[in-house]
Amino acid sequence: MINHENNDLFDLNEALKVENLTLNDYEEICKRLKRKPNRTELGMFGVMWSEHCCYRNSKPLLSKFPTKGKNVLVGPGENAGVIDVGNNQKLVFKIESHNHPSAIEPFQGAATGVGGILRDIFTMGARPIAVLNSLRFGNLDKSSNVDLLRGVVSGIAHYGNCVGVPTVGGEIDFDDSYSGNPLVNVMALGLLETEEIVCSGAKNVGSPVLYVGNTTGRDGVGGASFASSELTTTSLDDRPAVQVGDPFIEKSLIEACLDAFKTGDVIAAQDMGAAGLTCSSAEMAANGNLGISIDLDLVPSREDDMSSYQYLLSESQERMLFVVKEEKISDLIEKFNKWGLYASVIGEVIGTNEVIISHKGNIVAQIPTSALSDDTPVNFHNVINNPPDDLLNKWEWKENDLPEINEQKIFSLKENKKFSFSEIILKLLSNPSIASKRWIYKQYDSQVQANTVFTPGKSDAAVVRLREQNKKSKNKVFSGVAASVDCNSRWVALDPFRGSIAAVAESARNVSCVGAEPVAITNNLNFSSPENEIGYWQLSSSCNGIAEACKALETPVTGGNVSLYNESKNKDNLITPINPTPVIGMVGKIDNVEKAISSEWKNIEDQIWLIGSYKSDTTTAASSYLEYFHGEITGRPPKIDLSDEKFCQSFLRNAILNSLVVSSHDISDGGLAIALAESCILSARGATIELEKDLNRVDNLLFAEGGSRIIFSISKMKQNEWFNYLKQNQINFPSSVYVKKIGYVSSDTLKIKINEKNICNIRVEELTEKFNNSISDYF
């Protein structure tokens, strides 16, 4: 018989508001339980039926994604995805968000975001080997955004540095839409250390349920529900919903768990992340098609007089739930205690498909597992048939709407005066969204574990060395993995379908640019309210674009995260949604990391080449140039031909692996001119470029984005071999793909000629100063 702990006397409307549930939800809960829930049970349903936990608004759209592939070992549904990267090695990876917590408590919100994603990785039996992050903030001319950036970066650095996992790469962008709602997405990679992948499904009725890790407190209570609602002017009052992490306990937890997993004595494992003990127990039971009973009196706690509601909804960090072999309990507890961790048997696996919770001698919750975890509500929304009128109007924009170019200068619609192209390049380089992120990544330890091949900012994708493969060989060969996180949210805002295709294509292109083969993705879908028809249309269109690109590029989705209700409401109840931001985390494999290349030029007189697609649009529409120089966010983003995209990447990868290409850099934000400038800055070398243009819009040639384009350099010592490679592959070239020489590496100046006219002449020293100091000047 359930004891309602006197909490059956509660204000239903207030409780539903707190739990972010509707009256229809409540009626459905009563129907499933065949009775009214008590307050504790209502809280359990609140977190488990939140968008954060059950994807109730996005589940129908996620089914569009391809999830199977030749290298995929574990897809969506487990703690993280797993792929085969060759040589009997398995990579575990996933991306998660901690947006709302970071908005109100940036240091702890970001820090615990790192801790949470690391637990997803090592819960599968993998040692975390790298972290990347994708961050979004409002423009830095507002002091509150500077404070948020400082706090988030400090939190990520603190947790990652202390736990001993390198932060190897990432991206960051600034836009006014994120001023009230920053985005903090963290991706982690791990290498499997156990013979078998550790899964979460409970097995064997009667097996003990073991609690391991930190103690349980009141921090983070209701965090999942908080993450599934919009931010308002009163959100600072929700600081208790933000967890507090301890990276040193996490480090002990990593070592202890991997040690325990290797014994084979752990049957199932689940970390206590969102919704804490409620979610971990319900998912373990549901995934094993069994039940779990838990006695809260046995849960290690750090505070007195905690209620069952607080125990079950606490999101205290660094906690795990295991199903273990009964005869190995003593050995396991001793092992965990040795690492300074709490370990306590708090329940057992039961044969009935339900979660039963007792506290102080009474049953306080008894819920079918399917009701909590499997058969959760789905909110179906109508998708509008046509794009919103304001977008259709923006799609009408043409480059001819821009001012004419006179005497190698162009009038800025933003600043109402003329600038030379050299001045425009310097202005774009100093914009925080394009400028060096050195101030940020220098705070991260990117070299711990000694397997980081390129420091952040040096290459288009991070590259991490894996274990030595042939220990008997005199020539040590190390395989590696590459990873990149990407999203041009401006493109997605202007066309969610095309923009999302571009996000997948760019993330794959970045991985290919270091010489790795793109294998699979994890995604983090950051969107506004799905209850708004435009917001849901954006989400639906984005999912369609991701699905199409992943199928074409053969990079299946292994899992990820959906973060909705990313919008802020001011004191006048005016809602500001973020730009839709589907962040793509791409992973790739490379058989020999010695073959991987970076983005900077190598030697003077090396040739500079360009590859791209005629079928893919190349336009200044939706470009950084249009926004940052002319002050306009308009136009339809470039359309990418995925067949040509795939060919360009494959052709370049093979050239890299044949040691013909010595540097490579994709053309994205800022177009060709900025890509050239960045390679000059990274190498402290110049470039002499000669281009031809039939049309009179020089700005298109310099600053247009799209076109599946990559610049790369060929060693002057390898030019004969390069031309032989070109000749051998000529028969396979689609007529729509071009590859052409555009210049050579020089000493200390970026010089660009178009149709034999001097367009740009900037010393690398000047480029570097503008590029490196933009963000640091705010601190």
From Swiss-Prot:
Catalytic activity: N(2)-formyl-N(1)-(5-phospho-beta-D-ribosyl)glycinamide + L-glutamine + ATP + H2O = 2-formamido-N(1)-(5-O-phospho-beta-D-ribosyl)acetamidine + L-glutamate + ADP + phosphate + H(+)
Binding site for Mg(2+) 2: 120, 271
GO biological process: 'de novo' IMP biosynthetic process
Function description: Part of the phosphoribosylformylglycinamidine synthase complex involved in the purines biosynthetic pathway. Catalyzes the ATP-dependent conversion of formylglycinamide ribonucleotide (FGAR) and glutamine to yield formylglycinamidine ribonucleotide (FGAM) and glutamate. The FGAM synthase complex is composed of three subunits. PurQ produces an ammonia molecule by converting glutamine to glutamate. PurL transfers the ammonia molecule to FGAR to form FGAM in an ATP-dependent manner.
Signal peptide: none
Subcellular location: Cytoplasm
UniProt keywords, alphabetically: ATP-binding, Cytoplasm, Ligase, Magnesium, Metal-binding, Nucleotide-binding, Purine biosynthesis
GO cellular component, one term: cytoplasm
Residues the record lists as binding ATP: 55, 94, 523, 560
Residue ranges crossing the lipid bilayer per the database entry: none
Family membership noted in the UniProt record: Belongs to the FGAMS family.
Catalytic residues as annotated in Swiss-Prot or TrEMBL: 52, 98
Amino-acid positions noted as binding Mg(2+) 1 in the UniProt annotation, renumbered to this chain: 96, 561
EC number: 6.3.5.3
Protein name from the UniProt record: Phosphoribosylformylglycinamidine synthase subunit PurL
GO molecular function: ATP binding; magnesium ion binding; phosphoribosylformylglycinamidine synthase activity
Originating species: Prochlorococcus marinus (strain AS9601)
Principal place of residence: cytoplasm
